[in-house]
Every structure is written in structure tokens, then in C-alpha cells.
A protein has these predicted regions:
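Membrane-embedded alpha-helical segments of transport systems
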Residues: 89-93, 116-138, 163-167, 295-311
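Structured inter-helical modules in multipass membrane proteins
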Residues: 104-107, 213
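Predominantly cytoplasmic-facing regulatory/coupling regions of multi-pass membrane proteins
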Residues: 1-84, 143, 147-264, 295, ...
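Transmembrane helix boundary and interhelical junction motifs in multipass membrane proteins
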Residues: 57-63, 94-104, 251, 264-280, ...
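Transmembrane helix-loop junction
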Residues: 68-69, 91, 110, 242-243, ...
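Membrane-interface alpha-helices at helix entry/exit sites of multi-pass transporters
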Residues: 77-81, 95-101, 110-127, 287-299
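Hydrophobic alpha-helical transmembrane segments in multi-pass integral membrane proteins
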Residues: 267-271, 277-301
């Protein structure tokens, strides 16, 4: 396990443990949780389902804006299959979405996109998606810390997230200035494996950031899909709160959502336990009623986990069939080898 991965895991586990310590004394107040979840306001819960569908639509729109820029085999049907299969993989395996990224890259390569383009566009896709994430952490955290949103909470859920988001954004913009440098063959051979991989990853991220900035400069309309993806998913949590009573201020919901989803980096099935505990712990820090927080988060997680998972599994098998069709098409158009006549022998008298 890499140092970065170890640090992320330690941080996420710590967050879940702290959240558990905060929640444990309150569990008795929740009572029959699952019974109460099923007794939530059906209108608000149905609205939450609709909002989650809109979140998926935003994801597909962003996917097409980044990956499908010219004539391509990937139409809306294939875009749906790739994104839904990737989302199901992410929900089931968590681990920061690594499984979904790998599946998406596999499908793109099978469509005929070369590996370098897949890597660059995948990095740009993630930069745009998580750029919105970090910007929300910074803006919401700064607004909460300064009292701009009229909500008061500890620095752990205001200043710290804002600082983290700001540092990541600035670091990404600085990395965009990095360019590949020619390395002499001898020097390249002497470069250690870890250092070589680190340089490759850094330059790949830098290229991805530049690609994302180029899409922004071109005012690519489809980039609003990133805002729709996060915004409508947060709205699902907001609707879930309303299903069980009053919702806390929007600024608190946004921060609780993003702090909780940091636990999705844990290699747990669907992030079970980590995300739930992180979100509930954050809402307790904002003074939200413990019983309402638990019910709202459990309802949100049920909708956000199962709604893409079942269709996503179906989409995965559809995608396998689509990839098989692509392979058959490629085989059909490959030119047959032309037999080369053997050189004529010349008899010398």
C-alpha cells in the first residue's frame, strides 16, 4: 500500500471512529430506526428518488462532454451503459471510485480510443468532477467559518474543510504549469522505479488539469453535469431530511455531505459504515437532532446506493455485449492479408 493510500485510510478510519464515539451515546434515542425509515413521508422519499435520477443524468452529460468530442462509437446508449456500470462498480467496491475508473477506461479503449487519450481525458474528467467538490468545500467552509451563512459550528467542519479544499485547488493549478522534460536515456535508466512512477503520475495529473481548463475556456456546456451530479445528490439528502421532519440549513447539509463522502476512500463495500458515520458525525457537530440525522442519512444511503446498483449491474452486462459487437465490427473491417508471390527463379544457363 502506498504512503498516500495509507494516509487516506488512516484519516478515513479516524473520521469513522470519531463519528462512532459521537453517535454511540445517542443510539438509544433513535429507537426502531428501520421501522421509522419506512414510515417517512412518501412524497419526499419519491422526490429524493427523482433527484437521484437527475444526478445520474448530470453524470452522463459530463461524461459525454469530456470523452465524446468528435465522431465516436459512443452514443447516448453506450454512454449510459459505461457510466451506470461504472457507478455500480463504485457503489459496490467504494475505494474512492477506483473500480469505476478502471471499468470506464477499459470500455473506452475497447471503443477504439487510444490509451494516452483515455488517460488524459479520464484525468480531466476527475479533475472537473472533484474540482467542483473542492470548490464546494472551500466556499461552504469559508462561509460557515465567517458566519456568512448564519450557521455556527466547530472549526473541524468549517475551517479545516475550507483549508483542505483551497490547498487542493491551488496545488492542482500549480501542477498545470508542469511540462514534460526531455531526459537522456542514461539518466532515464538510472531513475528509480518509485521516482519514475511519481513523475509519470504527476505529469498525467498536470495534463489532465490543463485539459479541464481548456474545456472551461471553451465554455463547454456539458460541464454543468458536474454541478448537477453533486447538486442533485445533495438534494437527495435534503429531501430525506424533510421526509422525517425539518431539514437543517442548506450550508450544513452541503458540508455534512462532503465531509461524509470523504469516507468513500475506504475499501469497504459501498463505503458501508464509513460514509454513514462520517455524515452523521458531521451533522451532530452542527447540532442536528441525532434521531433525525440517522434516519435521513440511512434513507439517503439506501436511495443513493441501490438506485444505481441494480440498473448498473444490468448495464454492465449490456456493456459487455456492446464491447463484443465492437470487437466483431473491428474483425470484419480488418483487411485480409494479401499473399505475396514468391520471387521467380531465374535459370542461368
Amino acid at each position: 500500500m502506498s504512503v498516500r493510500r495509507t494516509l487516506i485510510t488512516i484519516s478515513a478510519v479516524s473520521l469513522a471512529v470519531v463519528a462512532g464515539v459521537l453517535i454511540a451515546p445517542k443510539i438509544g434515542e433513535v429507537g426502531h430506526t428501520w421501522t421509522r425509515v419506512s414510515a417517512g413521508d412518501k412524497t419526499w422519499l419519491l422526490a429524493a428518488v427523482g433527484l437521484e435520477v437527475l444526478s445520474f443524468v448530470g453524470y452522463v452529460v459530463l461524461f459525454r462532454a469530456v470523452f465524446v468530442r468528435t465522431e465516436s462509437r459512443i452514443d447516448w446508449r453506450e454512454s449510459y451503459q459505461i457510466t451506470m456500470a461504472g457507478l455500480a462498480d463504485t457503489r459496490l467496491l467504494a475505494a474512492g471510485g477506483a473500480g469505476g475508473v478502471a471499468l470506464t477506461a477499459w470500455a473506452l479503449k475497447r471503443s477504439g480510443m487510444n490509451g494516452r487519450t483515455v488517460t488524459q481525458r479520464m484525468t480531466s474528467f476527475l479533475v472537473i468532477l472533484y474540482g467542483v467538490y473542492m470548490a464546494a468545500l472551500f466556499v461552504d467552509g469559508a462561509g460557515l467559518a465567517t458566519g456568512l451563512f448564519g450557521v455556527h459550528a466547530s472549526a473541524a467542519v468549517t475551517i479545516v474543510p475550507a483549508a483542505f479544499g483551497g490547498i487542493v485547488i491551488v496545488s492542482a493549478l500549480l501542477m498545470a504549469r508542469l511540462r514534460p522534460v526531455s531526459v537522456a536515456p542514461a539518466a532515464a535508466g538510472d531513475e528509480r522505479g518509485f521516482r519514475r512512477r511519481a513523475r509519470h503520475i504527476t505529469l498525467s495529473i498536470a495534463a489532465g488539469v490543463r485539459g479541464a481548463l481548456e474545456l472551461l475556456r471553451r465554455r463547454e456546456v456539458g460541464l454543468v453535469g458536474a454541478i448537477a451530479w453533486w447538486g442533485f445528490d445533495i438534494a437527495v439528502l435534503w429531501a430525506s431530511f424533510h421526509a422525517f421532519g425539518a431539514a437543517p440549513p442548506v450550508a450544513a447539509i452541503v458540508m455534512g455531505y462532503f465531509v461524509g463522502t470523504l469516507a468513500n476512500t475506504l475499501p469497504l463495500p459501498g463505503g458501508v459504515g464509513g460514509v454513514d458515520g462520517g455524515m452523521i458525525g458531521a451533522f451532530l457537530a452542527f447540532g442536528v437532532d441525532p434521531a433525525t440525522a440517522v434516519l435521513a442519512v440511512l434513507s439517503y444511503r439506501a436511495i443513493a446506493f441501490w438506485l444505481p446498483t441494480l440498473p448498473g449491474l444490468v448495464a454492465y452486462f449490456q456493456l459487455r455485449r456492446t464491447v463484443g459487437d465492437w470487437k466483431a465490427e473491428d474483425a470484419a473491417v480488418e483487411p485480409e492479408p494479401v499473399p505475396v508471390a514468391a520471387p521467380a527463379r531465374v535459370a542461368i544457363a
